[in-house]
Amino acid sequence: MKIGIVGLPNVGKSTLFNAITNAGAECANYPFCTIEPNVGVVPVPDERLDNLAKMYNPEKVTHAIIEFVDIAGLVKGASKGEGLGNKFLSHIREVDSIAQVVRCFEDPNVVHVDGSIDPIRDIDTINLELILADLETIDKRLERAKKNLKADKKYQAEIDVLQKIKEALEAGKTARSVELNEDESELIKDAFLLTIKPTLYIANVSEEQLADVENDKYINEVKELAAKENAEVIPLCIKIEEELASLDNDYDKKEMLEMLGLQESGLDKVIKSSYDLLGLMSFLTAGEPEVRAWTIKKGTKAPQAAGKIHSDIERGFIRAEVVSYDDLMREGSMNAVKEKGLLRSEGKDYIMQDGDIVLFRFNV
């Protein structure tokens, strides 16, 4: 699963990407220093794995992963090919969701592409370019569907959905703000609309702003806008996150977080929220060889989850032996879990839950 980090030039995208991945993407105080997108594979923080590792003492611990893609800074006119517009739009089309970095801090030493700080204007600039690109896609799709309608009436349903989305786009709204049922979503899935992608707003703030996020004018403006489209906002000071990421050990990181009065790093929040944004969760396998988190979509049934480990396990699925992480931690061992009758045997219709610890039984 891929999250595209987007934003106007000089808002802190590449610095955020560097901090998240420690990949050292070129970062400079001028537009377009990222042309080909940098891709970083990042482990999803999960303390459940650490606790299971203490219990099982495995040879290795494997976290779930998520990919972040640092996409070139966008400018007005991108939908018409301005700046790096065409490349930007093709790269953003390939990601599963969007993390939009918005500059909310004042600093005369860091030039703003529009000369002043206005997070709502910046969000509107990016959203407008994506909306214009989507309108072009919708118009082409409508034209084709109307031609096909003459031969097959089933295209009327597609036309109705496209028309509904077009009206929202023309009103300056994103496609994700349009309520669609499952059938409607399926009809336009292969249109690969940009503004239908789930979006997370990252408000890049100063250290001073971070100390009082509830009362910050810029952050509250972004939250208000995000609420209208059911998006989440995470305020973070990307400069602090860069410093934290450069520290070698967890003790130093913890000490710095305590000094700043923070429970966890903003990056951990971004990674976890990105995982949620994509409707993902983890089931766990635990034993002496390995403790591991496996990524699945929420609502996945047991046989399909088994297929994440190996296709043979899905094909020959018999049952899943399941205990919840909380039950195992409370009882302290798998033997105690079995004695209390907390180890369940689940069949092919069982819907997996986040934190299920599973042993799949199969026969091929």
In which residue ranges do the predicted regions lie?
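Structural motif
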Residues: 353-358
